[in-house]
Amino acid sequence: MKTDYMYIRNTTQTDINQTYIDNINVSIDTIFATYFNKQSKLSFREMLKSQHKRIVNNNYAGYTNPIDKIPKSLFRNEIDVKLHIPLLKKEWYVEELKNINPSINDLIKIKIADVPSFMWHSVENTNDGLRLYLPKNEYVYYYLDKMEMVMNKLMNGESSLYLLGYYIQLAVICHPFEKVNFSLIMSQVNYILKLWNYVPISHGYLDFECFLNPTDIVIKKFKEKVFAFKGDL
């Protein structure tokens, strides 16, 4: 049976376009798999751009707006992109936020392992709720280099869920493209999990947790999800 690298029908993603899912699966089979197995001449950055281009296929056929056009597959530091993303609904917030009473323009720094601190703040009483600020564009290549270092270890036989969880967090915080970031990353992660004889996992709230937790907590939650997930959607 053909593997679906996108177990995405969950609380936050119920209306995924099937073409989008198909594009993701093809991008893994034709681009990422050859890269991961060292059968490609693409660099790490070229691989990301190529996979992104194949997924969007000149369109953003995702779940928020199936006809929303997006820019070419360029990193956000190569184009003029806003540096914040809203979390769409307050009820989707992770558990940790229940203990926070944010006020307008509160600024909190979260340490992400050994990379520059990631800053976010909340805006109360708005429809979009918490607003997350991405690292400045000047840090994008720095994060990509860290991602590549981790990926090289995975490609060279380090079958480590710790490294894989760290890769997810680096990628989520980097947010290299304007759109279609987490789908791309999780398709890679699910491909690797399948190679390691684990069941591919759903997105869940993992991206939110990457934004709001230090690395050790993110990896703990990722491991729990891998061990618990049975593929039942």
Language-model-detected regions and their locations in the chain:
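FIC/Doc superfamily catalytic core
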Residues: M1-L233
